[in-house]
Amino acid sequence: MFSKKPHGDVKKSTQKVLDTKKDALTRLKHLRIVIENAESIDLKQFFDQHFSHIYYVFFENFVTIEASLKQKGHKSQREELDAILFIFEKILQLLPERIHQRWQFHSIGLILKKLLHTGNSLKIRREGVRLFLLWLQALQNNCSREQLWMFSCLIPGFSAPQSEYGPRTLDNLINPPLNLQETQVTIEEITPLVPPQSGDKGQEDLTSYFLEALLKYIVIQVKSLEWKNKENQERGFSFLFSHFKKYYLPYIFPNICKENSLYHPVLDIPQMRPKPHYVMIKKDAETNEAIYCTKEPFIKARVIVIRWLVSFWLEPKPHTGPHIPGMEGEVLPKNIQ
């Protein structure tokens, strides 16, 4: 076990991770050494055997860093947050079977709410989206309604899902409204970990920004979860994509024909669509050219989804594809290649 040893004796670091007499920060440093120098198979086995120690080390250090961020909030504390989130990601990736059984369900959910808080910087919120999708990919059907509501609120600009409690937004899911008639005991309010800094680059279109992130992460993270049964990777993707279709596609493509199918296409000529109405929204500061936009909502989101789908259909194969005269330099669809 632990055949790679470019950084000292990894076995000694393993022992120090498990040594409860050592402080949490020391154990964290040695846990990082183990993660960075162990073979992937050995690392999976190590996490499976010592999951309780590993989560304790992570959580104790996360709490310390959170308190430090709220007191100081300097660049060094933000770098420490990035480092502890690396450990958090490894926990999500290497322990999907336990997470699927709701291991540390409330603790992990609380941490993700702190990352997804709308008062955080865009970088932290986007990282929260990425880690939340990893968690949901592991939970699959063992998640609760709250996680599905949160998934439906990850991309701002869409209608809030309805429930018996009224509209559900990311804000009231992270910090539910108080009802003092039910109980006098209230949970502590969740506050931002890293508010936007003065030099942070903003985004004019948050809907497009988070939509692109969500579509990217539900694909590229599929194989990052180390399931013992590899079929769960595809199940995890199917779970996320089915809920994307449920919560977002009806708004992005409100007039989509549900009767259409790749296997049983409708070949009738469709009715003419009305011509879109464009309005000038602003002028370019450098060129003074007018910038127009259609009044139709989610038009940019529609373009993003279409481009995302096309990226899987048009895949460049520079050396393996056949030569077709007149198509030099063109990217050919897979069915032509």
From Swiss-Prot:
Lineage top rank: taxon: Eukaryota
One GO cellular component, as annotated: nucleus
GO biological process: activation of GTPase activity
Protein encoded by which gene: RALGAPA1
GO molecular function ontology, one term from the record: GTPase activator activity
The keyword Cytoplasm is assigned to this record: yes
Keywords carried by this UniProt record: Cytoplasm, GTPase activation, Nucleus
Oligomer and partners: Component of the heterodimeric RalGAP1 complex with RALGAPB. Heterodimerization is required for activity. Interacts with the HLH region of TCF3/isoform E12.
Name of the protein in its database record: Ral GTPase-activating protein subunit alpha-1
InterPro entries to which the protein is assigned, alphabetical: Tuberin/Ral-act_asu (IPR027107)
PANTHER family reported in the protein's UniProt record: RAL GTPASE-ACTIVATING PROTEIN SUBUNIT ALPHA-1, TUBERIN
